[in-house]
């Protein structure tokens, strides 16, 4: 049986004082942006006890690892906490914050995950901070109410713009266009120019448009959690 990762923490005292954050990634091939994950993980681990989780507890498969960052990922994958927990076994009530980095694979698995939907429903009901970036925002589409309405209707958010998506060779076969889904579901969607830093904060929900929006989005998550203490 695969050993699940333990939350990232420092010493015992530090672990008790830090809030816990669930970091969810896609489990599909080339499912997680290396740049967004690295920035999310390093920044968030300074403020939270992090627990990484994926569907089935499958290993993260990173896309776009640069030569500069390759050593960091080699070291990361040797750590026990690099082994994700099973998303199916996660109890959302144990976590203070939820972070979903830019995950191109989210279109395939997270956007249809009933387990993530339950976690998001809990976080929304309790107004706990949620931060999603790039295609990680698409993962939010899994969360619907009993009447099939979207949990995030009436929220303002951002995510990959059509102008960013159209550059992808698989654009014509994408199962979901976030901008269309959000607008059709009653949310307010905004986007800046392609690759620009653009972050939207609405109540307890923080969304970033793309990879480049990762750091300011996570910084807002930390500030939001600090303000709730």
From Swiss-Prot:
<dbReference type="InterPro" id="IPR029062">
    <property type="entry name" value="Class_I_gatase-like"/>
</dbReference>
<dbReference type="GO" id="GO:0005769">
    <property type="term" value="C:early endosome"/>
</dbReference>
<dbReference type="InterPro" id="IPR050325">
    <property type="entry name" value="Prot/Nucl_acid_deglycase"/>
</dbReference>
<keyword id="KW-0732">Signal</keyword>
<dbReference type="GO" id="GO:0005737">
    <property type="term" value="C:cytoplasm"/>
</dbReference>
<comment type="function">
    <text>Component of the FERRY complex (Five-subunit Endosomal Rab5 and RNA/ribosome intermediary). The FERRY complex directly interacts with mRNAs and RAB5A, and functions as a RAB5A effector involved in the localization and the distribution of specific mRNAs most likely by mediating their endosomal transport. The complex recruits mRNAs and ribosomes to early endosomes through direct mRNA-interaction.</text>
</comment>
<keyword id="KW-0325">Glycoprotein</keyword>
<dbReference type="GO" id="GO:0019243">
    <property type="term" value="P:methylglyoxal catabolic process to D-lactate via S-lactoyl-glutathione"/>
</dbReference>
<dbReference type="GO" id="GO:0005576">
    <property type="term" value="C:extracellular region"/>
</dbReference>
<keyword id="KW-0964">Secreted</keyword>
<feature type="glycosylation site" description="N-linked (GlcNAc...) asparagine">
    <location>
        <position position="154"/>
    </location>
</feature>
<comment type="subunit">
    <text>Homotetramer. Component of the FERRY complex.</text>
</comment>
<feature type="glycosylation site" description="N-linked (GlcNAc...) asparagine">
    <location>
        <position position="212"/>
    </location>
</feature>
<dbReference type="GO" id="GO:0019172">
    <property type="term" value="F:glyoxalase III activity"/>
</dbReference>
<keyword id="KW-0967">Endosome</keyword>
<comment type="similarity">
    <text>Belongs to the peptidase C56 family.</text>
</comment>
<feature type="signal peptide">
    <location>
        <begin position="1"/>
        <end position="34"/>
    </location>
</feature>
<protein>
    <recommendedName>
        <fullName>Glutamine amidotransferase-like class 1 domain-containing protein 1</fullName>
    </recommendedName>
</protein>
């Amino acid at each position: 049986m695969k050993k699940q990762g333990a939350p990232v923490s420092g010493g015992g005292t530090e672990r008790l004082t830090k809030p816990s954050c669930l970091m969810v990634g896609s489990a599909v091939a080339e499912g997680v942006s290396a740049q967004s994950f690295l920035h999310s993980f390093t920044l968030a681990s300074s403020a939270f006890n992090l627990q990484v989780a994926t569907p089935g507890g499958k290993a993260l498969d990173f896309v776009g690892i640069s030569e500069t960052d390759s050593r960091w990922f080699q070291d990361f994958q040797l750590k026990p906490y690099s082994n994700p927990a099973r998303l199916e076994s996660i109890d959302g009530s144990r976590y203070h914050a939820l972070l979903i980095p830019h995950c191109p694979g989210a279109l395939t698995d997270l956007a249809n995950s009933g387990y993530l939907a339950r976690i998001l429903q809990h976080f929304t009901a309790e107004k706990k901070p949620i931060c999603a970036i790039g295609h990680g925002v698409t993962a939010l589409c899994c969360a619907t109410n009993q009447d099939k309405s979207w949990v995030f209707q009436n929220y303002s958010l951002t995510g990959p713009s059509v102008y960013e998506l159209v550059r992808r060779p698989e654009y014509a076969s994408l199962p979901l266009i976030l901008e269309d889904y959000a607008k059709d579901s009653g949310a307010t969607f905004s986007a800046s120019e392609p690759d620009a830093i653009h972050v939207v904060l609405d109540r307890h929900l923080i969304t970033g448009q793309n990879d480049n929006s990762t750091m300011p989005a996570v910084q807002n998550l930390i500030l939001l959690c600090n303000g709730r203490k």
